[in-house]
């Protein structure tokens, strides 16, 4: 078991893992939970275990009658997101839950952050008629790196486990669908990151990722880079090592992310525009991105919904709405925010909309908007941040977090964050009327509005 206070290991330049470290011979080799067991509609489901979480993928086309047995004593039980209104009936060690439609939620006992159960419900996805690569139920496939080509449709059947990574480069019309699992543990050491993306599509057009579970990858988990027309739907994305970002939308356009569950040990949903593996072709504008109806757990480190740090081209017309951030854990470094924009480069960031977002726990910061110079910087001239809109952001539990807005100043350059709008921000049901209510700290920022009233205009020196 990890010591999460002292042994969260980050190697900025990890030794390369040049080939898979192990071969899975059977689905039975994946560790199973001893704390939880789950049945749905009378059928027992497999509950997997990691040192950071347990999880069960529940696939059915009917209503869900769940029986979750918890085999260790506990005093307090929490089901998140609370917005789902799930009311459990507890009898003995068994928690009974009925769902009329598939939901993705957590079962947490006594506030434990590393032994929760993720219950990940989905409708069954049938095998598409145009399937070109099929992974069948009950089997393990050691693919190393699965390289796709144009018009590939990958089907991962419920109960199949694919061990390895998936890459696509300059492909059109590719899909990965199904209710099975892709496991990336073979590409990194047990307690460290590796210099390799998990599911990586570069310069692809018309990409669909739907239904499957991506768990324990070597670094960033789902990375559409310089892609157009991407849909990420109903995925379960879970990491347990540092730099284990959930989804990194990098230099891509016309992207939709919906109905996903993301638990990440770094940024959960992240927007970037930067060189990847020294490739300058992956620097491009990011626009027309919609992220909605997702459940997000940001474990240490990183941020839950992040723009940055590498924003080297224009970032505009993005919408984040109707999401539940159930945890944003304390980082103690530059990140640790539920919603953040970190501009370390020269791209202009504007017209970004956040609406109807519920935050159940933000241990460090709620909003964090900065222009800065840091170790991720590649462009010294800094881009502006302006016309940022927050509407109906609710903090539901926990301590009231601080928020920060800060521009950038040197003897030769000044870049101020401006025109940031906060409307209907509430802490435990209490509406914030002023920046003081929000615990908002500003520096080198102009024209900050709270409920339509300009509250901050700082003098230039």
PLM feature spans:
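Extracellular/periplasmic carbohydrate-active domains that bind, remodel
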Residues: 1-461
């Amino acid at each position: 078991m990890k010591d999460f206070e002292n042994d969260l290991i980050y190697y900025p330049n990890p030794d390369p893992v040049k080939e898979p470290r192990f071969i899975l011979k059977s689905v039975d080799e994946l560790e199973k939970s001893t704390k939880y067991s789950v049945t749905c509609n009378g059928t027992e489901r497999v509950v997997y275990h990691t040192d950071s979480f347990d999880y069960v993928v529940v696939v059915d086309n009917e209503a869900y009658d769940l029986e979750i047995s918890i085999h260790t004593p506990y005093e307090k039980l929490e089901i998140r997101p609370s917005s789902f209104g799930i009311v459990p009936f507890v009898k003995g060690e068994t928690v009974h839950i009925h769902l009329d439609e598939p939901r993705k939620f957590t079962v947490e006992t006594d506030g434990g952050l590393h032994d929760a159960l993720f219950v990940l419900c989905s409708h069954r996805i049938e095998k598409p008629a145009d399937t070109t690569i099929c992974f069948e139920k009950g089997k393990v496939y050691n693919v190393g790196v699965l390289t796709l080509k144009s018009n590939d449709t990958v089907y991962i059947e419920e109960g199949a486990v694919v061990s390895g990574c998936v890459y696509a480069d300059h492909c059109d019309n590719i899909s990965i669908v199904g209710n099975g699992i892709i496991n990336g543990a073979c590409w990194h050491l047990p307690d460290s990151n590796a210099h390799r993306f998990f599911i990586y599509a570069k310069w692809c057009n018309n990409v669909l990722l739907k239904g499957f579970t991506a768990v324990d990858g070597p670094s960033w988990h789902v990375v559409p880079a310089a892609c157009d027309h991407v849909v990420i739907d109903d995925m379960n994305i879970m990491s347990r090592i540092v730099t284990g970002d959930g989804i990194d939308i990098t230099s891509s356009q016309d992207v939709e992310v919906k109905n996903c569950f993301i638990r990440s040990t770094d940024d959960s949903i992240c927007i970037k525009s930067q060189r990847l593996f020294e490739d300058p072709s992956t620097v491009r504008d990011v626009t027309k991105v919609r992220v909605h109806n997702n459940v997000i757990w940001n474990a240490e480190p990183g941020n839950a919904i992040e723009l940055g740090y590498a924003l080297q081209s224009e970032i505009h017309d993005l919408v984040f709405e109707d999401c539940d951030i159930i945890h944003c854990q304390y980082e103690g470094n530059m990140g640790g925010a539920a919603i953040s924009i970190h501009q370390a480069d020269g791209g202009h960031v504007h017209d970004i909309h956040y609406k109807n977002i519920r935050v159940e726990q933000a241990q460090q910061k709620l909003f964090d908007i900065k222009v800065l110079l840091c170790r991720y910087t590649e462009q010294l001239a800094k881009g502006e941040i302006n016309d940022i809109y927050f509407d109906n952001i609710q903090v539901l539990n926990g301590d009231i977090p601080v928020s920060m807005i800060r521009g950038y100043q040197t003897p030769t350059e000044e870049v101020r964050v401006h025109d940031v709008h906060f409307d209907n921000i509430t802490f435990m049901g209490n509406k914030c009327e002023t920046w003081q209510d929000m615990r908002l700290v500003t520096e080198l920022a102009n024209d900050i509005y709270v409920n339509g009233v300009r509250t901050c205009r700082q003098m230039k020196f």
